[in-house]
Amino acid sequence: MLRIVLAVIAGYLAMAVLVFATFTGAYLAMGTEGAFRPGSFDVSTLWIVVSVILSFIAALAGGWVCTLVGRRRAAAVALAAVVVVLGLAVAAMEFTHSGEQVPAARSGEISNFDAMQMAQQPTWLTLLNPFLGAAGVLLGARFRKAE
């Protein structure tokens, strides 16, 4: 049981580190104007596509790491459940606090930190992310098993 708990933690940390690193790199590569729609904090279509791809890759890696540490598929299933539960909890918080502290208009360049805080993504993406993440985790676990 302890191995599964440690595997879930390791897999989740791998996902978090990859998401932070790749999203930071993507934002720096795209710049403010590439990541957001003109004059707003609504994310651009390009950002949506890139973020879905990067999130799925991070989930694959998380599932792979989780299975490496846990040595059983049960660890990846537990991580997938954690991803869905936490993802839906974050979505619920976003819906209850939607747009409270985000200025309506954006002008000029903004820092990576401010971009993370103020980005407004579509509702459908907020709801899709937990399930896409869980699918990536389970598929990543299968990659580990195939080796």
Language model: regions and residue ranges:
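Juxtamembrane/disordered regions of integral membrane proteins
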Residues: 1-147
